[in-house]
């Protein structure tokens, strides 16, 4: 083993706390890791590590299925999803299952089917996980070389990377096929207040799709989070799926170039750190997406975005006061700016008052009232429809505010209000988890780099201070 690669850089690649690598056994003596170090004991036991991963997948899928069935059992069709603390049914609804015009739930059976399928498949994964963890071969290299690997084998590692990329690409295309051929997906922008429709006219122009990546992340630009039509979203998945599949084929057929061999650390812990970094980035992006985007995450299911609830409040009071005789075009507010309407920095007519900061909001209930120069005064006077008033009043009272103890609403809200938006939950949880994943990335990257440099040996167990302390009992 010692002669494989440069000693300085690649040995000891796996960072053990004591001892050297040994293939058999999963105890501290043979692996250098105690039971609480989890999968670190399985670094060189590919069969057992497979079992751990399959069992983990089983737990994930079981949660999805059980939580899905729990939400179905508690679901009240007469109330909006976002009032019921649901986080899984809104995703199924967004995919167009069981949904009619306006986001109304017309059939809960597809949700039940989804839950049952996940619970059943979790049993298969659970059995596979237990089999490989307890009964299957400890290592796969001898009997099943296709599934075996050595962490330092760069060619094998990029082949595994390629297989993963192909699977991700297939996943992206599943959404494309659902939108194109299998009933379509929910479009919050469909005329008359949202509906399920098949996406026929995909956006495949690279300048449009990759233009999102070149946008500023700030303000009205919003990077990829600013996407606001389904043609772009589904077209983006065509591009993404194709890139993943072709990239996967490339990584299977090729070996890493010399610069990559030199630049990267090639050890199990290094791969773990790369994966944690990637998941962290995904989590931060998902956080922003669910918080700001009301196309991929329709407000009918997830509740309004923060800017949307704020603009809805301004709109609701504009409607009320206009009915009471106010001239909303010229009324002056307490600051000397327009009370109901004012101009944005670039000259558009926007809602006045505190909601001016959210002037770039786009929402299906508001866009029909815009003209070429922002909000159109004549439309505001003549064209406001009852459904727009109802929806804005509903969104105004369901802003994504609230604390962890589920006391919802603004700070002045009475205690009887018990509402926390799924947007708050999903964005907060993804931000927190992304942060933890990032810290894990730093930790494991540091250990992997130190091991590759040959100076990280961990704590010497023989002289660990706790060994000389009085036993607790």
From Swiss-Prot:
Binding positions for [CaMn4O5] cluster per the UniProt entry: 367
Superkingdom assignment: Eukaryota
Modified residues (Phosphothreonine): 15
One of the record's GO molecular function terms: electron transporter, transferring electrons within the cyclic electron transport pathway of photosynthesis activity
One GO term (biological process): photosynthetic electron transport in photosystem II
Alphabetically ordered keywords of this record: Acetylation, Chlorophyll, Chloroplast, Chromophore, Manganese, Membrane, Metal-binding, Phosphoprotein, Photosynthesis, Photosystem II, Plastid, Thylakoid, Transmembrane, Transmembrane helix
Residues that make up the propeptide removed upon maturation: 1-14
Cofactor comment: Binds multiple chlorophylls and provides some of the ligands for the Ca-4Mn-5O cluster of the oxygen-evolving complex. It may also provide a ligand for a Cl- that is required for oxygen evolution. PSII binds additional chlorophylls, carotenoids and specific lipids.
Cellular component terms (Gene Ontology): chloroplast thylakoid membrane; photosystem II
Family (UniProt): Belongs to the PsbB/PsbC family. PsbC subfamily.
Quaternary structure note: PSII is composed of 1 copy each of membrane proteins PsbA, PsbB, PsbC, PsbD, PsbE, PsbF, PsbH, PsbI, PsbJ, PsbK, PsbL, PsbM, PsbT, PsbX, PsbY, PsbZ, Psb30/Ycf12, at least 3 peripheral proteins of the oxygen-evolving complex and a large number of cofactors. It forms dimeric complexes.
Protein name (Swiss-Prot/TrEMBL): Photosystem II CP43 reaction center protein
Gene: psbC
């Amino acid at each position: 083993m010692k002669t494989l690669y440069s000693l300085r850089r690649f040995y000891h690649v796996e960072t053990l706390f004591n001892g050297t690598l040994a293939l058999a056994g999963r105890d501290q003596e043979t692996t250098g890791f105690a039971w609480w170090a989890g999968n670190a004991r399985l670094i060189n036991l590919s069969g057992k590590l497979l079992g751990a991963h399959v069992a983990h997948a089983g737990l994930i899928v079981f949660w999805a299925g059980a939580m899905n069935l729990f939400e179905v059992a508690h679901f009240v069709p007469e109330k909006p999803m976002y009032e019921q603390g649901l986080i899984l049914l809104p995703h199924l609804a967004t995919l167009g299952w069981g949904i009619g015009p306006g986001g109304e739930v017309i059939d809960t059976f597809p949700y039940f089917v989804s839950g049952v399928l996940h619970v059943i498949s979790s049993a298969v994964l659970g059995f596979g996980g237990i089999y490989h963890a307890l009964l299957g071969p400890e290592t796969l290299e001898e009997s099943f070389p296709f599934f075996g690997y050595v962490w330092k084998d760069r060619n094998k590692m990029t082949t595994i990377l390629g297989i993963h990329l192909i699977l991700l690409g297939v996943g992206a295309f599943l959404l494309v096929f659902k939108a194109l051929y299998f009933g379509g997906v929910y479009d919050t922008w469909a005329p008359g207040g949202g509906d399920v429709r098949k996406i026929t006219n995909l956006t495949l122009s690279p300048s449009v799709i990759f233009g999102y990546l070149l946008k500023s992340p700030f303000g009205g630009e919003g990077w990829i989070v600013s996407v606001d039509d389904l043609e772009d979203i589904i077209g983006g998945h065509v591009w993404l799926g194709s890139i993943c599949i072709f990239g996967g084929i490339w990584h299977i057929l090729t070996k890493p170039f010399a610069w990559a061999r030199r630049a990267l650390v090639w050890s199990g812990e290094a791969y773990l750190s790369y994966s944690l970094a990637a998941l962290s980035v995904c989590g931060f992006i998902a956080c922003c997406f669910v918080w700001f985007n009301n196309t991929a995450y329709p407000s009918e299911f997830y509740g309004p975005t923060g800017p949307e609830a704020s603009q809805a409040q301004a709109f609701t009071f504009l409607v009320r006061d206009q009915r009471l005789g106010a001239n909303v075009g010229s009324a002056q507010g307490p600051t000397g700016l327009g009370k109901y309407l004012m101009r944005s920095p670039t000259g558009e007519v926007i809602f006045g008052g505190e909601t001016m900061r959210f002037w770039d909001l786009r929402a299906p209930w508001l866009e029909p009232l815009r003209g070429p120069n922002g909000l159109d005064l004549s439309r505001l006077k003549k064209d406001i429809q009852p459904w727009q008033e109802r929806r804005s009043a509903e969104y105004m009272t369901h802003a994504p505010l609230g604390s962890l103890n589920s006391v919802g609403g603004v700070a002045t809200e009475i205690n009887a209000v018990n509402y926390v938006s799924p947007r708050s939950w999903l964005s907060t949880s993804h931000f927190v988890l992304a942060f933890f994943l990032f810290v894990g990335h730093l930790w494991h990257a540091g250990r992997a780099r130190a091991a590759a440099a040959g100076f990280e040996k961990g704590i010497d167990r023989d002289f660990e201070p706790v060994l000389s302390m009085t036993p607790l009992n």
